């Protein structure tokens, strides 16, 4: 078995380099023809690691307090906005999500209220939330955020997909796994056709299985 090194704390200079890499990646996406980019601050990846108490043990300006743990996400967003424009930039979070062993701590929703308020000042194109059921928090975000709000509720049944839009809790509802399993998802929904069931065993596997082999309607 290959030995996995223990992660170490980035220096502040290295943090600046990583922020610059986000900026360069955004520029590259636009030059390649993308309409915009979504900054991935969810699912246990680097931005959420800065936000989370059990992975961010820093004692400098990027750790400790709510403001400190939020700083990296805000600086990444500012760098991307400066490079490609706010109208081309969205950001995604998964408040209280625990993927990859993440634990954001007891004050996580207070932290997100602060973070979202600060990001709102940048007038990003949208905020994309994975929502895990704290309805008051979602209502609070709706008040804090002035631009488009996208909401994904993992595991929500198809007949409930539109409820957040219907109840003015979101502008857009996003779908993940169902779309992976149904390359013609929109057509199936419009026509009432049955959906392919996602194969969870292949979601993170290599090869075409679960990637390009789901059947079309015709």
How would you label these PLM feature ranges?
Residues 1-218:
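Flavin-dependent oxidoreductase catalytic cores
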């Amino acid at each position: 078995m290959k030995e996995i090194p223990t992660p170490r704390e980035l220096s502040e200079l290295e943090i600046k380099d990583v922020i610059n890499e986000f900026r360069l990646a955004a520029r590259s996406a636009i030059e390649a023809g993308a309409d915009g980019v979504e900054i991935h601050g969810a699912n246990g990846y680097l931005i959420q690691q800065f936000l989370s108490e059990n992975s961010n043990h820093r004692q400098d300006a990027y750790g400790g307090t709510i403001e400190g743990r939020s700083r990296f996400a805000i600086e990444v967003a500012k760098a991307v906005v400066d490079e490609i424009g706010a109208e081309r930039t969205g950001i995604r979070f998964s408040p209280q999500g625990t993927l990859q062993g993440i634990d954001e701590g007891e004050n996580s929703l207070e932290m997100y209220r602060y973070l979202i308020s600060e990001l709102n000042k940048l007038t990003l194109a949208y905020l994309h939330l994975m929502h895990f059921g704290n309805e008051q928090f979602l209502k609070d975000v709706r008040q804090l955020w002035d631009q488009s709000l996208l909401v994904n509720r993992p595991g929500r049944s198809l007949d409930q997909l539109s409820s957040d839009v219907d109840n003015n809790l979101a502008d857009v509802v996003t779908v993940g796994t169902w779309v992976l399993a149904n390359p013609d998802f929109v057509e199936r929904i419009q026509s009432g056709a049955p959906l392919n069931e996602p194969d969870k065993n292949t979601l993170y596997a290599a090869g075409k299985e679960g990637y390009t082999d789901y059947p079309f309607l015709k």
